[in-house]
């Protein structure tokens, strides 16, 4: 507590105790809170778009797309080729956006966007396809299998303040975007025709929300 600004408390902690609390435990707690908030916001956005209380990132293949992107980056050893930035999160984000685009394209029929149920079915197909590609890549590159699984499953044991500082801008931008779209999602819950009558563009709103949630 005495490390916080404007707080004058004598904690009587040793240097080792301070290092354990501030350098090891605190960043894991903060990172866990940020990740949990982002997952909750993302899930709420998906449920608002699909009007389905069971919607999650797996329905559109977003998780599979992110896993495939990360797998390609790890297997291709892009971390060694690009030293100034970690390419794995960027590749995962690109894979997630690709999954959204693929599911959205498959759900379009005769130039019109399909129903949320059609989009979900397209997402399941995209998820299975991307998962099959990811599994094939893993089988062909067994030496990186452990690293790939460690990234996909996720862990906080190695988290530090560097990871927290890296995540904060993304969390702030994405959560702000999702909060700004709450009103539009409420209108979409009534129906696309009513939303169009009020001057909204349901298709554009869904795309923006899905991209932000991804």
Walk through the language-model features, giving the residues of each.
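Alpha-helical transmembrane segments in inner-membrane proteins
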Residues: 1-214
